[in-house]
Design a protein with these regions (language model features):
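Conserved lysine of the Walker
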Residues: 205
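N-terminal accessory targeting/assembly segments
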Residues: 1-125, 136
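NTP-binding/hydrolysis catalytic cores, primarily Walker-type P-loop NTPases
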Residues: 347-414
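Hydrophobic positions on the alpha1 helix immediately C-terminal to the Walker A/P-loop
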Residues: 208
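Walker A (P-loop) phosphate-binding loop of P-loop NTPases
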Residues: 202
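P-loop NTP-binding catalytic core
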Residues: 75, 88, 92-191
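Switch/coupling sub-region of P-loop NTPases
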Residues: 193-195, 211-334, 340-342
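The Walker A (P-loop) glycine that initiates the GxxxxGKT/S ATP-binding motif of P-loop NTPases
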Residues: 199
Length: 414
């Protein structure tokens, strides 16, 4: 038997009437009330046990969780969820996009869920501030755009992360990087090289930054700086996580990435990790890298290593009018290694290049490719002519080895 939206809403109102609003009730207490009411309703309507259980789950999620989104959030194989108004919900599973058969019962219910998401992280979203980035309790990143900025209805984009963050061994197993290249990066991190990770949307930058951070020695003091906290550093006891704050209509001032970088440098860090450079804070990141904070890590959106350098120049100019040669000199002296990630046609994510910034000459930054991902089709008129050979190959050697030598590491085999 199919229960109508109207009947579900009435049942929900009966359950709400039973909830004691004078105190905070636990999930167990709420679930018990839901179960009791659904049991009575199920007997009256001759529901099958499976139908009653599905109804209980739906009502509990609508009261205590994130309504129809909760089932998608609980599925470990789903990586992204997109809500386009109350009627349309899409999700990405195993690299493919699907439309959900679920929808919100009304625009009001969608807005209730939006307020719940924003409020859980002390963020405010309303007509005065209709766009907000936030995160869920499980670490998922959320972007919200309210109607009428989102013309066809309020939009939500959720990027999920695994409960247990990927370590480099996972990425090797998924063939995102070779064991040899991963070992090379491990030595670079241990030696205190400043590393910048670039890639397009969904290329795995945050995941890779997590994996790189795994190599940081346990005893070092690490400060992470993010718009919305996403990094999940494992077994790092001396870790301080900083997160930006938006301004609101009550006069609370914003706290920006730039503010947090300046604060972090006064906190005696061994390493500063900036989740993503998007604007004028790029200048502060470069200055941190150039003032003795070796081993710093960050990421940025770009289509290649060269494109990342151009974008960094533009971002620095957002914060201060500096001559281009001065900016390029800062980049060349601050960043040691560029790692570029990409998403392939088969939806897999790969490390496409590991490149050293080798120097700065005649107003140009000199790049030295060390590893590069190659994709070659087999020769025609052979048995394997439709086969594509894909592998990461070593194409050069590290030029600047001073940090590695000071840290006591040998280049043999790297």
């Amino acid at each position: 038997m199919q229960t109508s939206d109207e009947e579900i809403q009435k049942l929900r109102e009966h359950i709400l009437a039973e909830i004691d609003l004078t105190r905070e009730m636990s999930d167990t207490e709420i679930r018990a009330i839901v179960s009791e009411k659904c049991s009575i309703y199920g007997k009256q309507k001759f529901l099958k046990l499976s139908e009653q259980e599905a109804l209980e789950q739906y009502l509990f999620h609508s009261l205590r969780k994130l309504d129809v989104l909760q089932e998608l959030l609980d599925d470990p194989e789903i990586t992204e969820i997109m809500v386009n108004g109350a009627e349309h919900i899409f999700y990405e599973k195993r690299g493919q996009l699907f439309e959900s058969d679920k929808h919100f019962t009304s625009k009001e219910k969608l807005n209730d869920v939006i307020q719940q998401m924003a409020g859980s992280n002390n963020r405010m979203v309303n007509e005065a501030s209709p766009i907000v980035d936030t995160r869920l309790a499980n670490g998922s990143r959320v972007n919200i755009v309210l109607q009428p900025i989102a013309i066809d209805g309020s939009a939500i984009s959720i990027r999920k992360f695994p409960e247990q963050p990927f370590v480099m061994e996972n990425l090797i197993r998924f063939e995102a990087i070779t064991e040899e290249a991963a070992e090379f990066l491990k030595v670079l991190v241990l030696s205190g090289y400043n590393i910048f990770v670039s890639g397009g949307t969904g290329s795995g930058k945050t995941t890779f930054l997590n994996a790189l951070s795994q190599f940081i020695p346990r005893e070092e003091r690490i400060i992470t700086i993010e718009d919305s906290a996403e990094l999940q550093l494992i077994d790092k006891p001396n870790l301080v996580r900083l997160e930006t704050r938006n301004a609101n209509t009550e006069g609370v001032l914003p706290i920006t990435i730039r503010d947090l970088i300046k604060t972090a440098l006064r906190m005696r860090p061994n390493r500063v990790i900036v989740g993503e450079c998007r604007g004028a804070e790029a200048l502060d990141v470069l200055q941190a890298m150039n003032t003795g904070h070796d081993g710093s890590l960050s990421t940025g959106h770009a289509n290649s290593c060269k494109d990342m350098l151009s974008r960094l120049e533009t971002m620095v100019l957002m914060g201060m009018e500096l001559p281009l040669p001065a900016i390029r000199s800062q980049i060349a002296s601050g960043i040691d290694i560029l790692i570029h990630l990409g998403r392939m046609r088969d939806k897999s994510r790969k490390v496409l290049s590991i490149t050293e910034i080798a120097g700065y000459e005649e107003n140009n930054i000199i790049l030295n490719d060390i590893y590069r991902f190659k994709e070659e089709k087999a020769e025609e008129n052979t048995v394997h002519e439709n086969t594509v050979h894909r592998a990461m190959e070593k194409v050069g050697d590290l030029i600047h080895t001073e940090k590695m030598i000071r840290a006591g590491y040998c280049l043999d085999g790297l």
